[in-house]
Amino acid sequence: MKELAKQYDPSQVEDRIYQFWQDGGYFHTEADPDKKPYTIVMPPPNVTGQLHMGHALDNTMQDVLIRTKRMQGYAALWVPGTDHASIATEAKVVEAMRAEGLTKEMVGRDGFLERAWDWKTKYGNRIVSQLKKLGTSCDWQRERFTMDEGCSDAVKEVFVHLYDKGLIYRGNRMVNWCPHCNTSISDAEVEYEEKGGNFWHLLYPVKETGEMLELATTRPETMLGDTAVAINGEDPRYAHLHGCHVVLPLLNKEIPIVCDEHADMTKGTGVVKITPAHDPNDFEVGLRHDLPIVRVFTYDGHMTGAADKAAADALFAAGKNTVNEPEVLDCGKYAGMTTLEARKAILADLKEGGFLKEIEPLKHEVGTCYRCHSTIEPMVSKQWFVKMEPLAKPAIESVEKGEIKFVPERFTKNYLNWMKGTRDWCISRQLWWGHQIPAFYCDDCGETVVAKEMPCTCPKCGGSHFTQDPDTLDTWFSSALWPFSTLGWPNEDSADLKYFYPTNTLVTGYDIIGFWVSRMIFSGLAYTGKAPFDTVCIHGIVRDSQGRKMSKSLGNGIDPLEVIAQYGADALRFMLLDGSTPGNDMRYSEKKVEAARNFANKLWNATRFVLMNLPEDFQPGLPEESKLDMSDKWVLTKLNQVAGAMTDNLDHFEMGLAAAKINSFIWDVYCDWFIEIAKPRLNSGNAEQADTARRVLVYVLDKALKLLHPFMPFITEELYQALPGSAETIMTQSWPTFDEAHNWAEEEEAFEKVMDYIKAVRTMRTEMNVHPAKKTSMIIETADPAPFRNAEVYLAKFAFATDVTFTEKYEGSTDGMVQVSTHTARGFIPMMELIDREKELARLNKEKAKAEKELAMFENQLANPKFVERAPAALVEEIRAKRTNSQSKLANIEQSIKALG
């Protein structure tokens, strides 16, 4: 038998155990016709990222599921991988180049990509090694990257397929533009923050009447791009202005007054300025009224100037402009200013000209980039889009029919709301790192050819020279294909794809249901004809101890690797799961980590005790039932119940409940009770009794380690290998299940009667400060003495009884006796010679006063007819039960006071 160290040191165990698992190939899975598959694909963390608490929670949950299914006999595959993270990675590389005095343009696209791949190689393995520290049992032989050859092939296949079906198109549309990242981003990537601002009330003169039209805007710098003012056609206040014009202040330019329902008669003055190039609603108004689209911002957040206008004019002159192509304004004195600088200058000029009426402070939601948190500029830009309506419909139906379930179910609504409200998806990004769009433009005639590879001949003019579109695809485009691109698609003959797809469970946070979950669902249905998974298990975020979101700005982030270094990975994993509930946020608690570490130490010490009491020739296995005593059947029944309950919990993704159950069983049932109960038999001198106790101790420990293994894999592996008769690894052992043969309900109930009585006696002795060495006789009054008679050895050991008398009704003298009561027994214990009488009387009188106050409170509640009539019936019954308990408690205290004279 393996000898365990005196104390558990995770730093001496975890790396060695993980290497043992990897060397043994225990994480690797192949298609097996004799087994059912169970597949999880890891949400790929950013290749430049590092492990944070969200990763730790997400991957611990996945590991619990995959380890459990592996032990349940499934061909359990967990596919790991990383995401190329276009925006984040490009920003990192650009920042590193800036430190060298270089820009992207200086080194060129090829030079930049070479640096980006070097960066990926240097930092890409960091988060993988950190995930291994956590104990993740991924099939690392199948590790994937969203820009590896297989994923790239899948991306091209999908793009060409969608384009050929008319579901991908290129056009000038309103997009969310990040001036810092210098790229468009999708609606899902815009985060909204409440910020302070103003409504600036401006006055626009009407050309035909000379009157002033008042309107309000939060962005006065956009007024240079106004191409109309809108009123509601039903608004009687402005009926006389139909067909009129206003003169745009500062530019002295005539623009029309249009009638459009976008102008709400009930809000403000009912007049709105229309800037089609820089507002999504205004863009739609512009399309309805065929208004010019005039861009006044550059892509890096400055006001446009003469050079910008000249470039745009040249495009129009050459006939290369496309539908909805924006004109560009030379903003004159404001050209080159940042948008905020221009705002100040424009407002000053408006005020000077008498066009600024008033300023109204307000709080409003401002769109920001999810990566850099810069303010998003709505911008009309030529981009690639996916038509969402045809793809969204089957994805909505699949969830509504129950083919895909969300856990908790409430997140189904989030998903459906997102899918039903989604607009066409802008998939092009003005970046170099990522999947370059497989669209090629003929250098001779400008024809667009979409193909997986560079075409040889132009189908329109026969030319042979092409330029590939410089933009890359949204990172989420490739991530949307992750469940099947990682399993061999588009090769539909792939053995892995046939066996492991569709996958089973997706574990992810609620914050990326729109970003990622929705896109995987419609992609799986569109390209494979199957939903990519059947269950989406949603978890919350890990907050700090005060309930705040962890962030760099608050400085409240907790590094999981530091926690692992101090407490071990098992302690961190258990803290994250114990008591957690699906879909809800949780708080990081160092006290809970310490408690998990203490739990590991408790288990270690218990295992050492068991091993130290085994002879060299010990052979594991339960003895025949006739040799089991009441306590053996009790602990085996408890183990059986826990195995059944945990299996049910895990089937329903209630990992927190499952963790709490095995914690309670090992600590409370096995360590605090059964080991202590076994000691008298181990030391009894009776070889058969000692052997039975040993066998039950080892059997229960073996099963408990297996139940705990998915949650705390390192310590359970180390302890399991120390048990006599253990196999090579706990990972591949069978998961314990409910066994009717080990369900002794009567013995369980009987033994718990004894336990309750022992607990009551020990509590009483503790309260009365009686030393454990002081023992006394006792009389037990009970209608069912059999369990107590069968447990006299335990009453002597744990209730400190010298001898026990049993009676159905005790009618003797109670002088000098203290009473203890449970729901099935009452004990009369002579305590006078063991205690300080005066001190005990003082304590009892204090307890009596407390009990009387408690009873009075319950009686007052029940004496109030309004409470009894209006309160929920269950609450009234609960108060009545508490009153009854208080009455019984008070009676026992009074009896004890009387006994002490």
Predicted features along the sequence, with ranges:
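Secondary-structure transition/capping motifs at alpha-helix termini
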Residues: 67-75, 96-109, 129, 133-138, ...
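Active-site-adjacent bridging/hinge elements
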Residues: 34-42, 64, 100-103, 128-135, ...
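Residues forming anionic-ligand binding surfaces in small-molecule and nucleic-acid pockets
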Residues: 391-409, 497-499, 853
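N-terminal, positively charged nucleic-acid-binding surface of large information/translation enzymes
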Residues: 1-234, 275-288, 292-311, 343, ...
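Short hydrophobic beta-strand segments
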Residues: 37-43, 49, 273-274, 443-445, ...
